């Protein structure tokens, strides 16, 4: 099989780089590159600078594992939140969606993925050890009394919720799952705030 050579020119490398974005194929990447160079070179420069800064400065919160420029994110640093409640989500985008409902006042843990053996995603790849440590030895010193499983209602999300629930069951911690107001196969990122708020309130 012939080896595919990397683009040698700057335009080709830009098009290839844009293809790392989800849902962006060769033609979409080409349209983006042409648009930026033809219509908005200043915007392209700002985009390049902002992306470089984010890659250099954005890491993960030491407590909840979400994206953060500081060791502990603003949510985990907020003393008004209830440290005895912990909501587990798959991605930072899911955390943002839960926050927008204004119906959850506890803390979070972001898995940065979900169990999917076919994709090589096991417990180690979703920071499961860090999650257990967060639950067993909370940074706040306040024991966690309830864990809310807010993974997506996909087959992988359900498997992840089931796995976490089974591991936590012997520890005597209340484990709840958000209600099924969210369609089967649905992802939190695309659910409206009202539906998600009801799913949180009706958790069981």
UniProtKB/Swiss-Prot annotation:
Pfam families given in the database record: RecR_C, RecR_HhH, Toprim_4
Biological-process GO terms, alphabetical: DNA recombination; DNA repair
InterPro entries reported for this sequence: DNA_Rcmb_RecR, Rcmb_RecR, TOPRIM_dom, TOPRIM_RecR
Origin species: Polynucleobacter necessarius subsp. necessarius (strain STIR1)
Keyword vocabulary terms for this entry: DNA damage, DNA recombination, DNA repair, Metal-binding, Zinc, Zinc-finger
DNA damage in keyword set: yes
Identification of the protein by name: Recombination protein RecR
Zinc finger (C4-type) residue numbers: 61-76
GO MF assignments: DNA binding; zinc ion binding
Similarity annotation: Belongs to the RecR family.
Phylogenetic lineage: Bacteria, Pseudomonadati, Pseudomonadota, Betaproteobacteria, Burkholderiales
PANTHER family (UniProt xref): RECOMBINATION PROTEIN RECR
Function summary: May play a role in DNA repair. It seems to be involved in an RecBC-independent recombinational process of DNA repair. It may act with RecF and RecO.
């Amino acid at each position: 099989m012939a080896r595919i050579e990397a683009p040698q020119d700057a335009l080709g490398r830009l098009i290839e780089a844009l293809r790392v974005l989800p849902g962006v194929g060769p033609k979409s990447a080409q349209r983006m590159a042409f648009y930026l160079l033809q219509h908005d070179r200043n915007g392209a420069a700002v985009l390049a600078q902002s992306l470089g800064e984010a890659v250099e400065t954005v890491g993960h919160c030491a407590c909840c594992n979400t994206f953060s420029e500081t060791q502990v994110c603003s949510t985990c640093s907020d003393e008004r939140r209830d440290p005895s409640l912990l909501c587990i989500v798959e991605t930072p985008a899911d955390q943002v969606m839960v926050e927008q409902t204004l119906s959850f006042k506890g803390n979070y843990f972001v898995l940065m993925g979900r169990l999917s053996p076919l994709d090589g995603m096991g417990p180690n790849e979703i920071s499961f050890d860090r999650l257990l440590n967060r639950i067993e030895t909370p940074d706040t010193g306040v024991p966690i009394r309830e864990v809310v499983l807010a993974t997506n209602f996909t087959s992988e999300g359900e498997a992840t919720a089931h796995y976490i629930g089974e591991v936590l069951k012997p520890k005597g911690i209340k484990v709840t799952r958000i209600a099924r107001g969210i369609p089967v196969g649905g992802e939190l990122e695309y659910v409206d705030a009202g539906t998600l708020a009801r799913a949180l309130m009706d958790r069981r």
